[in-house]
Amino acid sequence: MPSIAASQRATPPSAAALGGLYPPFRFSYVEENLTRGAYPKPRNFRFLRRLGLQTILSLTPKPPNDALQAFCAEHGIRSIHLPVVKAKETIPFTYSKCAQIVSVLIDAAHLPMYVHCLDGLVVTGVVMMCLRKLQHWSPTTAFSEYMRAGPDAPDVGAPEFAEKFPGEIVIPPCIPAWLW
């Protein structure tokens, strides 16, 4: 059997040559068709496109930048912006605002969805803890998930906020099977 010289062997193209698939910082799956992470950058768009997203939910002080808006428009992705200030020393929103956000998350008409804040940590993390409370997770388990997203998360009172979250939200007409 003839041997092929090392220089003649076919080498697979590099990830960069293929365009690369780069998930957003702190990307993770929350539930089927629900993902979360940090503010997506253009290098993340190819990865996000492969998720078949219906919606990108931005929990940020300002509306999505031009690049993210153009990406959504080009791929038929609904962009929802719910203004939330950057977290500093406390949770940057009210229980009412959190209930509004969770109501969007559990509306099956918006799924598959990617939800993000600026850093994918405090704002998104607290919202996910409140979603987990709605799903009857124990506070300890919900906080453990929060810490996995960023063990260096600042102490802004996330566990206390989620524990006191009343869970009084508007249930949309069509909810995902994973909710309850």
Segments the model singles out, each with a brief description of its role:
Residues 1-114, 119, 126-180:
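Cys-dependent protein tyrosine phosphatase-like superfamily
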